[in-house]
């Protein structure tokens, strides 16, 4: 691939991003994780590590430093650049799916510092490789220093066990009530580091190692060439280890360091023995094999190298992280969980099914599901105390999308319980209840109620009295019903199919009758029946979502469809559409919390990448292949009109938003937030609606909507238990057309591709006028 920016480039078919300088615009981090552990590794090796279970605890907060000292000359340097900011002769940081490696050369010593998180356990493994590139023997001292954060210093104790070589830190929660003591006993947390080669000296005290509180200067221990030893009590703990290494010319030395947390020193010893028996290489291979399986579910080859890299590699990683770690939070909305699982279904349908079912168990017998929830069993707080009304619609949209991937009608008959009830019902019945609830919770204009907010949950002013109505909720329900009806028909449930059709028509008619403002659809009606999101509003006139979802749901047609598209295009920037225009400049009680958000950020007028994918989806529905692809490509941090050097972000994940005020010097800056609903929708929209390799209730269908100047593209996709290699040709230079399909060299006329478990199909598709 071509170099994407002055700071780095993709290589190995997009599987690696190479950063060529330690001096990036921001902390350009990779994130490595398993189901219970997460760490961030910047281009200089810095970042936090978090253990999720038994409860979230942060360790190694603040710094991870490595120092090398030449014992003959006294020369010292930092192979990670920080903290001494030693200028290396050569430097590169290689971020990949499961690892980060930082290579540098200083004073004729080539160093490689490599880190990964094994598939199981709460630990990370660091490997230091030193090579003497000179012609003289070298005697070096290697110092490693990890800040072992463990819940405060007032009750902390850090010590080194000479026999096991385990340096560990433990801190019992200092401010704990009498009644909380037993619970704390059950959640003890010991943070540790240990080497595979014995340490020559160690430090447990941050002050002792650095010689004071300045952690950015050359440490006192490094100056002396040796750590002082001794334990630390009621002070900042540190895991510092020193080893002497001698190297002949051309010789290489390898040292491993394991950092993690456990419930006791005995558990660490046991884990250490298991790791030694298994071997570091085996653990690394397991990690690489896992990612090979995840990335192998589908592969695209289009004329757009950047989109290829994200679709084939980085979006898959991001969606796995968000789903498997629950976005690293116990405080989250079910809409996030469900939309993450929607994307996850494209790489692990079975895992996505279990995740969605765990969310579905939160649905009440009425059909309602609370939007913001605490997943750790703690009492509700903040947004969890509010009633956002869009939860049920996401159950339908995301679970039907999952069912399309799985093709398992038996899953619809699986019994799932309800929150606060001993009752259970089939998944199909759960979805019908969700539709019935939403359709029954309507206001004076026949639209779905707003409550404390819809998808745009900081709009909590208009519906706070219980009468406000949401145009978006209504459009989304129409879309959801259309997604559910094919499963009603598949099950032979014509009665519910007809009833749902009637509801969808009624709601669509209400939107077109009440919500059209002459040039676009309004956002809704407040508790007093006054429309908002209209041309008469000074701020918040035009909302992207009600235009895109009017198209996605089929509510907008004819001239209104054209006007919706024109309104959408008026919101465009070089990196995607703004979520609304104009943004709010200050508190407005009519609108609520959204007006308190900084203009140009998040929901208040940013280029909100999640909503940008709704726009790309709508473009595909409208047959605008070039516009859809442009939006997808512009949303990536590799966008040449807003490159990493300008947006400031490492280009291995899509952010939550880009700053949206055109007259601000921060226009286009990335939020750097790795948690976003963009990921699932970009995967789904790109694969199934732009490239058109679409899973349906009746099988895999082909319906591309691409840039007209594309001559061809290829998609390899595992679908259910079969594999397809699909080559699409576009000799007429069109965005959308009829498709002429051959399967294994034979003409294929059916609407869906053939399916037989275990088969591999070669498919050729030609777009025709």
Curated annotation (Swiss-Prot):
GO terms for cellular component: cytoplasm. Keywords: Carbohydrate metabolism, Cytoplasm, Glycosyltransferase, Transferase. Optimum temperature is 35 degrees Celsius (for the reverse phosphorolytic activity). Retains more than 90% of its original activity after incubation at 30 degrees Celsius for 1 hour. GO terms for molecular function: carbohydrate binding; glycosyltransferase activity. It comes from the Bacteria. Its main location: cytoplasm. It is found in: Cytoplasm. SMART domains: CBM_X. Its EC number is 2.4.1.392. Belongs to the glycosyl hydrolase 94 family. Glycoside phosphorylase that catalyzes the reversible phosphorolysis of 3-O-beta-D-glucosyl-D-glucuronate into D-glucuronic acid and alpha-D-glucose 1-phosphate. Cannot phosphorolyze cellobionic acid and laminaribiose. In the reverse direction, using alpha-D-glucose 1-phosphate as a donor substrate, the enzyme acts on D-glucuronate and its artificial derivative p-nitrophenyl-beta-D-glucuronide. The apparent catalytic efficiency towards p-nitrophenyl-beta-D-glucuronide is approximately 5-fold higher than that towards D-glucuronic acid. Homodimer. This is 3-O-beta-D-glucopyranosyl-beta-D-glucuronide phosphorylase. The lineage of its organism: Bacteria, Bacillati, Bacillota, Bacilli, Bacillales.
């Amino acid at each position: 691939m071509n170099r994407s920016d002055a700071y780095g480039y993709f290589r190995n078919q997009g599987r690696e991003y190479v950063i060529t300088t330690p001096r990036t615009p921001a902390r350009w981090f990779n994130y490595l994780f398993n189901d219970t552990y997460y760490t961030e590794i910047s281009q200089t090796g810095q970042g936090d590590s978090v253990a999720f279970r038994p409860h979230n605890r942060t360790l190694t907060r603040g710094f991870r430093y490595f120092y090398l000292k030449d014992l003959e000359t006294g020369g010292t340097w930092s192979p990670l650049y920080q903290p001494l900011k030693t200028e290396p002769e050569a430097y590169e940081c290689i971020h990949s799916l499961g690892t980060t490696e930082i290579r540098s050369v200083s004073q004729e010593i080539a160093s490689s510092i490599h880190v990964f998180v094994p598939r199981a356990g709460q630990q990370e493994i660091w490997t230091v490789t030193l090579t003497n590139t000179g012609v003289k023997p070298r005697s070096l001292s290697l110092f490693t220093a990890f800040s072992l954060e463990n819940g405060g210093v007032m009750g902390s104790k850090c010590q080194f066990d000479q026999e096991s070589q385990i340096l560990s830190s433990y801190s019992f929660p200092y401010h704990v009530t009498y009644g909380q003591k037993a619970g704390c006993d059950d959640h003890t947390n010991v943070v540790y580091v240990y080497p595979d080669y014995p340490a020559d000296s160690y430090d447990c005290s941050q002050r002792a190692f650095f010689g004071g509180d300045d952690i950015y200067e050359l440490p006192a221990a490094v100056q002396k060439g040796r750590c002082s030893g001794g334990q630390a009590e009621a002070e900042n703990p540190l895991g510092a280890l020193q080893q002497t290494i001698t190297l002949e010319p051309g010789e290489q030395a390898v040292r491993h360091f394991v950092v993690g947390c456990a419930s006791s020193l005995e558990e660490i010893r046991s884990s250490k023995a298991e790791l030694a028996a298994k071997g570091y290489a085996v653990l690394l291979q397991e990690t690489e094999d896992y990612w090979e399986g995840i990335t192998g579910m589908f592969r695209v080859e289009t004329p757009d190298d950047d989109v290829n890299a994200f679709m084939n590699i980085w979006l898959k990683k991001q969606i796995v992280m968000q789903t498997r770690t629950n976005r690293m939070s116990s405080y989250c909305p079910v809409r996030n969980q469900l939309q993450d699982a929607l994307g996850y279904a494209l790489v692990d349908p079975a895992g996505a099914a279990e995740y969605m079912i765990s969310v579905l168990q939160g649905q009440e017998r009425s059909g309602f599901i609370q939007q913001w929830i605490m997943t750790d069993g703690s009492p509700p707080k903040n947004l969890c105390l509010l009633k956002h009304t869009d939860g049920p619609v996401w159950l339908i949209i995301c679970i039907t999308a999952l069912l399309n991937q799985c093709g398992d009608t038996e899953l619809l008959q699986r019994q799932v319980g309800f929150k606060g009830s001993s009752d259970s019902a089939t998944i199909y019945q759960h979805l019908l209840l969700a539709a019935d609830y939403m359709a029954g919770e309507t206001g004076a204009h026949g639209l779905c109620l707003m409550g404390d907010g819809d998808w745009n949950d900081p709009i909590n002013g208009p519906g706070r009295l219980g009468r406000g109505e949401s145009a978006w909720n209504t459009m989304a329900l129409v879309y959801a019903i259309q997604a559910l009806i094919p499963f009603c028909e598949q099950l032979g449930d014509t009665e519910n199919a007809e009833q749902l059709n009637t509801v969808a028509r009624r709601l669509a008619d209400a939107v077109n009758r009440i919500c059209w403002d002459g040039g676009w659809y309004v956002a809704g009606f407040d508790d007093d029946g006054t429309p908002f999101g209209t041309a008469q509003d000074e701020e918040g006139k035009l909302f992207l979502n009600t235009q895109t979802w009017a198209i996605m749901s089929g509510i907008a047609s004819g001239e209104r469809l054209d006007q919706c598209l024109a309104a959408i295009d008026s919101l465009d920037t070089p990196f995607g559409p703004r979520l609304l225009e104009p943004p709010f400049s200050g508190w407005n009680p009519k609108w609520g919390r959204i007006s308190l958000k900084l203009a140009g950020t998040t929901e208040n007028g940013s280029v909100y990448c999640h909503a940008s994918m709704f726009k790309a989806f709508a473009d595909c529905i409208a047959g605008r292949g070039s516009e859809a692809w442009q939006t997808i490509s512009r949303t990536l941090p590799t966008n040449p009109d807003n490159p990493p050097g300008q947006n400031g972000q490492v280009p291995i994940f899509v952010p939550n938003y880009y700053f949206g005020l055109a007259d601000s010097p921060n226009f286009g800056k990335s939020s750097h937030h790795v948690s976003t609903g963009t990921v699932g929708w970009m995967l789904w929209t790109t694969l199934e609606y732009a490239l058109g390799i679409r899973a349906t209730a009746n099988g895999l269908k082909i319906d591309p909507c691409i840039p007209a100047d594309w001559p061809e593209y290829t998609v390899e996709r595992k679908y259910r238990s079969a594999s397809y290699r699909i080559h699409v040709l576009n000799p007429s230079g069109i965005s959308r057309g009829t498709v002429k399909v051959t399967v294994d060299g034979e003409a294929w006329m059916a609407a869906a591709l053939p399916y037989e478990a275990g088969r591999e199909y070669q498919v050729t598709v030609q777009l025709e006028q």
